[in-house]
Each structure stands twice: as C-alpha cells, then as structure tokens.
C-alpha cells in the first residue's frame, strides 16, 4: 500500500507564490510507485483546497477559477487517523474524506514556516516532514537564531534589535546604529525570508529609508554590520541534529548589494516557467578552494545541528573577501525548491531527496513526527 502524502503549499505569507512553485515542483518529482500524493493548496486565508487542478502550475493564473473547480477541506483527526474532510461538513450525501499518512509542508515565510503551521500539524496528530515547532520558530527569528549560534561558537555578524517602541523615537535609533555599528549596515525585518524588506544603508538618509521600509513588514527589525567586500555562499544540509550531511556549495549571482526578492524569483519567472529558486543565476559548484569548501560545509552541518533542525535546510553564508572570514547569515528551514539543485551535483536526485525526507522516523520527536 502506498504512503498517502499531503503536499501542502501556499498559505498566509508574503512568500505565498514562491511556495506554490516549490510545492508543485515537489509534487511533480515524488516517487508515485511509493507514494499517493495529494496536492493541498492553502489560500492566503489558510483555507485548504484539493482537486485535480491543484497540482498544475498553469491553474494558478486564475485563482478564483481554480477554487471553483476544487474542493475545500479541513484537517480532522478521528480515532487517531487524520483526514482531509470536505468543508462544510455534510451529514448525508457529502464527498468522502481523504485519509493521509504524512503531511509534507512546502511553505515559506511568516505564519507557515515559523513554527505556527508545524504546531497546527502537531496538534492534529499527523506525522510531518521537516523541522519541529522549536527549530522552525528559531530559524525564522534572525535575532534569536544569532543568539543561539553565538553560544555554539558559530561566527555571526554584530547586530542590534529594534522594536516599534524604538521606531517611535527614530532619531535615537539612528544614533545608536551609528555609534554601535557604523556604516554600512544591513536592515532586515527580524522574521521574514526571501530578502523581503532587506536593504543596505550607507548613510543616515539611507538608514532612515531602510528602517521605514523594514517596519512595513515586521514589528521587530534587525540592523547588522554590512561586509563591504562581500561574497555569498550557500549550502544545504540533510539530516537531523544527530546525523547530517552537506550538499554542494553555490554562489548566487545578483544585481545589487544583496540578493533581492526580484533576483530570486521575479526576474526568473519571466520566460523561464515555474522554476523558482532553481532558476536563480548561480555558480554550482561555487569557485572555492578545497579547504574553504570544506569549511563552509562543516559550518553548515554544525549550524544545522545547533538549531535542532530536521529534513532539508539551506544555510546562507557570507565571506569577507578582505580577510577571508566566513560568517553564518541565515537558515531557510524550508528552502525554495527544497534546494534540490544543490543535491543533484553530489549524486542525490530530487526524487531520492524527497524520499529520504519522508521516510525515516525519529524517536526524539514522538510517535507522530517524521523527518529525514
């Protein structure tokens, strides 16, 4: 009997569209000899829909029409079994509920990748793929993540955290940044991904604009020292906090001081189909010395374990070209395209990657949780 996998994507997030691409990519690459895959689209109100059109990327050109052709469902637990139950529930004559064995969230950003959705799945009692609630939450909060990694001797850049109350006295905030960090700095919403709301500031005027922009997306903002002569290197990790391996390294190419949301998704969507992060301009493998490559891969595994991660994550690093120092930048606990393009060069095809993410159980996450 095939394992019934609910592949969930979309959701209430600014990275909604990116998640749709990642989710459908995963659906298309599942081993259908082993798995019965149920694509589940979550709207921007987190309503769940299933149906024949849900797994087709071309259907998302008109969401209203897609939803009319599809069935809204809710997740229910009956006697320890989890179902996707048609909603509204009808006592007689309604459509049959679909039983699922495993939930596979392919969601990105706040409200879905930050532990909130993982907590929902845990409450429902459904085994799920990937990081647990704690690791997901820490991985999304850049400030807490830095604090944890600093305690584990992982090199991170100096940073300052500001809240809305600090923003109300912005001149004092600007003074603190100038005194404590100096220019240039990078300003980031504390809990968003895909470079949303992130910008570089090289003077007080730019810093004011950057802070204004970041607070449009979050109630907390991180300001950190910016490396002038920067090189970005990414590496994926597969495993758990006890046993993990690193992928090949990549160097993403971009048009500005930092890799923007447009670099990652928008520019590549024009004429390139639904490739998501797989279509970003990059060098694979990154041009690194054997020693630096192994340093990146070792630090990626160490960071992954320190944060208590499971499944597949992508870790983004920075190299200061002036002194060769390597710094942890951020982790994506559910990376765009599940970072499959970093595993293929080391002999792990996408189908095998998905299989390994689903099928191994951990005694540390309870009877209902799955991870790699």
Model-predicted segments: where are they?
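Glycine-rich phosphate/pyrophosphate-binding beta-alpha loops
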Residues: 108-109, 195, 252-255, 332-344
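Short acidic-glycine loop/turn motifs at beta-strand connectors
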Residues: 43-46, 239-242, 320-323
């Amino acid at each position: 009997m095939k394992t019934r996998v609910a592949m969930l994507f979309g959701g209430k997030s600014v990275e909604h569209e990116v998640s749709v691409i990642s989710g459908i990519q995963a659906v298309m690459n599942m081993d259908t000899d082993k798995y019965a895959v149920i694509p589940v689209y979550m709207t921007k109100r987190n309503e769940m829909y299933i149906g024949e059109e849900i797994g087709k990327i071309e259907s998302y050109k008109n969401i209203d029409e897609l939803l009319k052709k599809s069935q809204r469902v809710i997740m229910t637990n009956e006697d320890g079994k989890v179902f996707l139950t048609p909603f509204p529930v009808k006592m007689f004559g309604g459509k049959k509920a679909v039983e699922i064995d495993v939930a596979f969230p392919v969601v990105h950003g706040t409200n879905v990748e930050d532990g909130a959705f993982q907590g929902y799945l845990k409450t429902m009692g459904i085994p799920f793929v990937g990081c647990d609630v704690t690791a997901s939450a820490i991985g999304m909060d850049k400030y807490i993540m830095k604090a944890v990694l600093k305690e584990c001797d992982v090199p991170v850049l100096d940073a300052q955290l500001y809240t809305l109350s600090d923003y109300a006295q912005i001149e004092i905030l600007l003074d603190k940044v100038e005194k404590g960090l100096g220019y240039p700095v990078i300003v980031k919403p504390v809990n968003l991904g895909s470079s949303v709301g992130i910008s570089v500031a090289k003077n007080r005027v730019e810093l004011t604009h950057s802070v204004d922009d970041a607070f449009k997306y979050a109630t907390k903002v991180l300001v950190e020292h910016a490396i002038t002569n920067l090189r970005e290197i990414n590496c994926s990790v597969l495993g758990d906090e006890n046993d993990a391996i690193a992928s090949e390294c990549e160097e993403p190419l971009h048009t500005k001081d930092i890799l923007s949301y447009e670099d990652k998704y928008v520019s590549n969507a024009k004429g390139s189909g639904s490739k998501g992060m797989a279509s970003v301009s990059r060098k694979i493998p990154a041009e690194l010395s054997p020693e630096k490559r192994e340093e990146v891969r070792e630090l990626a595994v160490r960071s992954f374990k320190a944060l208590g991660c499971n499944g597949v994550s992508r870790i983004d690093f920075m190299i200061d070209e002036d002194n060769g120092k390597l710094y942890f930048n951020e982790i994506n606990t559910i990376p765009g395209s599940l970072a499959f393009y970093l595993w293929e060069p080391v002999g792990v095809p996408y189908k095998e990657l998905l299989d390994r993410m689903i099928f191994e159980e951990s005694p540390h996450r309870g009877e209902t949780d799955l991870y790699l």
